[in-house]
Amino acid sequence: MDKLNDSSFSKLIERVDYLTKYELKYTCKKIKSRIEKLHLDEILDLRNTKYENENNIIYKILLKHKNILTKVILEFKDINNSHINKFTDKLTFINLNYCQKIDNDALIHIANTCHNLTHLELYIIPSLSDEGLKEIIMKCPKLIYLNLSGCSHFGEGSLLLLPKYLPKIEFLDLTRNYGLTDKCVEEIVKECTELKYLNLYALPKLEMNFLKNINCINLEFLDLCGNQNVTDEHFKKASDKINNIKKLNLSWCTNLTDKTIEYMFSMDKNKNLELISLHGILGITDKTIDILKNNKGILHNLNTIDLVACSNVKNRDNKYIKNIFKNVECFQVFF
């Protein structure tokens, strides 16, 4: 290992499970020194690890190393609030995706303890509600990354606090947050001007009027999949403010037409586009291809385009598309 540079050493150690990493650390002084120098002992990532008596082992790791850890990834682990209670203010990155035995008390502990938190993921935890989330929003002022995908019990009681307490948030995933209202989204996109990622996948009841007042000039990712209320007129208004989009998912937004593409991508607008999904939109025709190919930036940057079930695009054969957009390698998107 002495011959490995720091980058190679880091990649090697990151592939080792946490317990083995610590055995190495306390077996060899040189390895210990490099692990500490590169802060590799600060990361607890158990995504690809499975232990016998796992909950007990995770608890002991959190207890023993709580004053070292800055990043914990415990997604899909069967942990509970007792594990969360070992979190300290050292943590800046927490991934609790699908940890379905935690509840609002866990969020309240994080809010009261982890004031340096910048990254929080809470994918599909049905027991969570506004009671816990509002504490996170009000007490974790450094938070810029928030994944709430599949948490269906959040609503105005917490999400309306985002613009006031987290105006600099950059990443927000609200997929299947069925308590989300148009009022919430309108306030968020008007005041959270640093947003780069906004996911509103599978929220068909949103009226989409927020697009007329969007103020997120740095937005790079927007997912509106499945919304049949969004229209060309919404994008006509939004196109004045959205000019840095890289990934746009409009799958099954069936009221859209070529006009949306014209508003968003003509005259070299949004020239950094890398991915676009228009899956299932009958209002899209060959004119859309013409608009995209006349944008020189898109001609170079586009690598993914989904035209599946766009039956009014007559020339949508993969070879034909590839001949126009040389860097396209993917023709169907799965979000």
Placement of each model-derived feature along the sequence:
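N-terminal adaptor-interaction module of cullin-RING ubiquitin ligase components
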Residues: 1-111, 116-119, 129, 133-137, ...
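Phosphate-coordinating loops and pocket residues in cytosolic domains that bind phosphorylated ligands
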Residues: 14, 266, 294
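Inter-repeat linker/turn residues at the boundaries of leucine-rich repeats
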Residues: 29, 67, 89, 100, ...
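Short, solvent-exposed loop/turn at the beta-strand->alpha-helix junction
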Residues: 50-58, 76-84, 100-108, 126-134, ...
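Residue-level detector of alpha-helical secondary structure
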Residues: 289, 293, 322-325
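Leucine-rich solenoid repeat scaffolds
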Residues: 299-335
